[in-house]
Amino acid sequence: MTKIKIVVIVGPTAVGKTALGISLAKAFNGEIISGDSQQVYRQLDIGTAKATQEEQEAAVHHLIDIREVTESYSAYDFVQDAQKAISDIVSRGKLPIIVGGTGLYLQSLLEGYHLGGQVDQEAVKAYRNELEQLDDHDLYERLQVNNITIEQVNRRRAIRALELAQFADELENAETAYEPLIIGLNDDRQVIYDRINQRVDRMLENGLLEEAKWLYEHYPTVQASRGIGYKELFPYFVGEMTLAEASDQLKQNTRRFAKRQLTWFRNRMAVSFTAITAPDYPQVVHDRVRDFLGQKEKS
């Protein structure tokens, strides 16, 4: 079976994945698929660092604004939606470029997180039943024992992540439809942390507070409201924190999230990282994609 070539851009939040994705889409006739668990939600634009209207006009984006904030979204949903988007993009002779930081979603797509194929479905069912009998404390203890970090922890995500870890050997042998080139972006920790702090400041200047307040007033308990970028501001709305304290909390949580993202990508995906401050960074990445696609450099 001829596998479909796709480019996947990963890295911590605020590292510049969107800009690189657009650059590659322009250079290699590509379209972008968002691999971010929060960008699927309509009306949540600033806190999710969604591609701006200008950026979406520069390159076609998929899997953005496809759910209402009242709806849930899972790794399974992402796999189904991403597979459809990839097929659509390829059918028009274009290159699928997945840009995102939700490691569980990306691994689900690339490694068969549906737990089908060669995996013993009865064994999966039995293991799932075992996990469902555990209380929250014991379930999250299992995560720690297996060195699993997941974003926006809840029982469903925890159980699915443990299933993936339990049946990893079978999944590694399963046939996948894609041949990915995984491009990792990173840099010195302080560079990333400075970029995160600056991004949070820009978000607040651009209206994040109003966006978070709307979410808090209308849908404070939905899945979307638990994402980093919103819940940190809720204490400010009820007078439990000053805006400066809430902003600092948001920066701190985002930095911690970036660290967890890097840990996930290093431990779970075959990725080599490129420093975004390297003088030849853009050219190196473009050359890698060109080689991957078997194209010659234009003179």
Swiss-Prot record:
Its EC number is 2.5.1.75. Keywords: ATP-binding, Magnesium, Nucleotide-binding, Transferase, tRNA processing. Residues 36-39 are annotated as: Interaction with substrate tRNA. InterPro entries: Dimethylallyltransferase, IPT, P-loop_NTPase. GO terms for molecular function: ATP binding; tRNA dimethylallyltransferase activity. It is an enzyme of class 2 (transferase). Monomer. Belongs to the IPP transferase family. This is tRNA dimethylallyltransferase.
